[in-house]
Each structure stands twice: as structure tokens, then as C-alpha cells.
Amino acid sequence: MALTTWFWVGAVGMLAGTVLPIRDCIRHPSHRRYDLVLAGITGLAAIAYTTMGLGITATTVGDRTVYLARYIDWLVTTPLIVLYLAMLARPGHRTSAWLLAADVFVIAAGIAAALTTGVQRWLFFAVGAAGYAALLYGLLGTLPRALGDDPRVRSLFVTLRNITVVLWTLYPVVWLLSPAGIGILQTEMYTIVVVYLDFISKVAFVAFAVLGADAVSRLVAADAAAPATAEPTPDGD
């Protein structure tokens, strides 16, 4: 099957995933800001896959083709995933900011690794791995400590966080095996694996988030019941 076919499969899958938060937003207008983040995750990914299907943003690095749209997608959508997790945990603005910055740093290092050859790409890969370790600390340690006592919110957060951590940890392994790394995976197989990982890490994330709408309703209700002048967060926000 041609590579472009897999890109179109990814585009259709992401577009289908975008319907879920849009429908939830229509049914529950109070969830709007949560649903807009979710719609951005799959909606922007659908646009990226469409451009790859059309052959746009493809560039040659050495003897391999790099699809810049894929990395631009990750540069935008992975922070949205982190943002959604932070919206559930509510750690404070400064903590959320450094988590988002860490995520962008990791993806930027990945872009640099994809666009370079030789020793440089491995240096950028190592830098990205170090950044990812910091991001994991935030996802596994910092955010859970900030969670409130509501069991529904905690359950939703843990489910989404675990999906994210497990799948995101597979991406660098797949990259190592790809033509950009040691070349065990050929281009078509690498593309298939990434489409599959993207689908689960984005569409499944969005689907579980929408299914957990009750947890979001509880957060919205808590906000509505909170006094106009809120207590300072642990971050001082």
C-alpha cells in the first residue's frame, strides 16, 4: 500500500475523532474550553495528515524523506494533550507552563534530529531524551500531586495520563528503529507504526476524555461554586 494511502487513513481517523468533542460541546456548552482543546488535538492532526497525503511539506535529508507536517503536528498537538491533563489536575500556571515548555523542547529536539545527519542527529536525540525525562517527571509526579479529591476526575486523569506516557515512550523507540535511526524499519513500516501510534495517542485520548464528561462536569460545577476570589495556588498563581 502506498505511503499516501496511510496518510489518508490517518487523516480520516483524526477527522472522525474530532467529531466526538464537537458533539460533546453541543450537548454540554459548559464543557466548551475542554472540548476545544480536544478538538484541536485531532483536528490539527487531521490537517497535518491531509498535507502529507497531498505530498506537501516533504523534504529530503540525506537519503531519506522527512515529512515536516508530522513534526509540526506534534509541536502543536502534544502541548494540547499536556494542557488537557493540566486542566484536569490544576497544578497552577507556572507548573503548567514548564510542562508545556518541556514538551515543546522535546519535540523541537526531535525536529532537529530528523533534519540532521551523522553525529548531530544523535546529539539532538539525546537532548530530547533528557527533556522527555523531565516531562515524565511532571506527568508522573507533579500533576498527580496537584489533583483534587474527586475520584472521577482522578480516574479520568490517570487513564489519560497512562495512555499518554505509554504511547509517547514508544515514539523514540520507533524513531530509533526507523530510517532516521538505525534503519531496521523501512519507510512504509515506520509510517504504518506512527499512524497507529498517532491514532491511539490522539483519537483514543480524545474518546476517553469525552467518555469522562462527568468528571469535566464536576470541575465546571466546582468552578461555578467557587468564590470570586480564589485562594492562591501552591505555585503562587
From Swiss-Prot:
GO CC, any one term: plasma membrane
Alphabetical UniProt keywords: Cell membrane, Chromophore, Membrane, Photoreceptor protein, Receptor, Retinal protein, Sensory transduction, Transmembrane, Transmembrane helix
Membership in a protein family: Belongs to the archaeal/bacterial/fungal opsin family.
Subunit annotation: Interacts with HTR-II.
Task of the protein: Photophobic photoreceptor responsible for the negative phototaxis. Activates the sensory rhodopsin II transducer (HTR-II) in response to blue light.
SUPFAM superfamilies per the UniProt record, alphabetical: Family A G protein-coupled receptor-like
CDD domains documented for this protein: 7tm_SRI_SRII
Topological domain spans for side Cytoplasmic: 24-31, 90-92, 148-150, 215-237
Protein name from the UniProt record: Sensory rhodopsin-2
Positions in the Extracellular compartment: 1-2, 54-67, 116-119, 179-186
One of the GO BP terms on file: phototransduction
Gene3D superfamilies: Rhodopsin 7-helix transmembrane proteins
Subcellular location per the Swiss-Prot or TrEMBL entry: Cell membrane
Domain of life of the source: Archaea
Species name: Halobacterium salinarum (strain ATCC 700922 / JCM 11081 / NRC-1) (Halobacterium halobium)
Residues annotated as transmembrane: 3-23, 32-53, 68-89, 93-115, 120-147, 151-178, 187-214
Gene Ontology MF terms in the entry: monoatomic ion channel activity; photoreceptor activity
Membrane topology term: Multi-pass membrane protein
